[in-house]
């Protein structure tokens, strides 16, 4: 059954390519970008995305390809970069990628209150949409996005139906299969009629993708960790440019250069005390070096060796939460906790445990590769074994809450080698749907003193929960305060209006009696 399906799909892809070349490219070669035509002949997934969106009807798919390719050349999609977009548009933060919904789809934010309808800038705004979508499509081929229409504090000047229609067309024609859903937050009543029109543009099948939400419902689709405070979330993210804010996971620093002696002295507590609930500093003689790099051609001077022995290394704080994935258990589950510069405990630990019967290859990527050293960042883990990964900020660079880490893992065949060359080849060939991914956020603990603090699981979780609750309550309090201020302003306005009407009425009555008795 699956084999027949694959054969039918291959036939449809082949027919689509052949007919598009014969019926469209010959007559309209100057209307298309040659790079798009070439990609159509090579990228099966791209062709399949158009076919799937048109229910495998080749005639409809060809029309869609024609419209899409003409638009791509008209707006120069393949050549779009940051310099193609006016800097003020990138700085204002009306459109950007940040965070994930509960299904793991990237969030495509559209902050409508920052948009002003203006025909002079509409082309630049369309290019901005295309820039972000093309940038995402090249990195995450086939992964859908969730569009977040944030309509809070939106005025009449921000309503631009042509711009909304363009966004809808992007997902209907230009980037098929990339739309997971459209979450519309805090829609003003005056836009009800407008979004009835939007439903007709989407078509009957895509209407179900529209999700109208308020502060209570939006958390059904996006966790509070990726929602801003005005949506009832706890995400501290503040948009700024430069740089671009999307999660661009890259190779960390340690794979691009030599590992210094400072990193080689990294060590961890080797024996867990039974019955003890405190983390203590232990001497270097009781610790074993972690992930020491072995190079027979590289000699270490006696002075450097003495420095290693004399240096005092603090014990790592043991991660207390675990993400249980199908290939690896990853600890911590969600956040990497770094100590402050003052505390001197800037390093943190990621523990990977292989829960399969085969070797699992893993890679670690980060959105800030120039800031972190990761050891090891590309290796493998034997069945049932655990690997400790040391993450440390490079030099004096500070940890940011916007930084992210991505753990990628895939199961290897038993006959596969685990050397650097074999791992490189393995990652080139492994299908994307076989790769497990897990993301970790960064958090700085300003006054962390794990040598003297008692770290009980329950107390630790309680403090995390309490902190999150306080942050959530504070954001709700600020939102209530803002609404109260708005109500006070409206009351003052009505009071002034009433006073003016009273004065006007008094003047009218006075004039009436004056004329009556004079």
Swiss-Prot record:
**What Pfam families does this protein's entry cite?**
CRAL_TRIO, Motile_Sperm
What effect on the protein does mutating residue 404 to D have, as reported in its record?
Prevents binding to the FFAT motif of target proteins STARD3, STARD3NL, RMDN3, OSBPL1A and CERT1 and impairs recruitment to interorganelle membrane contacts
Q: What is the lineage of its organism?
A: Eukaryota, Metazoa, Chordata, Craniata, Vertebrata
Q: Source species, please?
A: Homo sapiens (Human)
Instruction: Cite the residue spans of the region called Required for FFAT motif binding and phosphorylated FFAT motif binding.
Output: 365-366
Q: Identify this protein by name.
A: Motile sperm domain-containing protein 2
- Please state the span of the N-terminal signal peptide per the UniProt entry: none
Single GO MF annotation: FFAT motif binding
This protein's gene is called MOSPD2
Give the UniProt tissue specificity note: Highly expressed in CD14(+) monocytes, and at lower levels in neutrophils. Does not show significant expression in B-cells or T-cells.
Give the keywords, sorted: Chemotaxis, Endoplasmic reticulum, Membrane, Transmembrane, Transmembrane helix
Which ranges are annotated Basic and acidic residues under compositional bias?
265-279
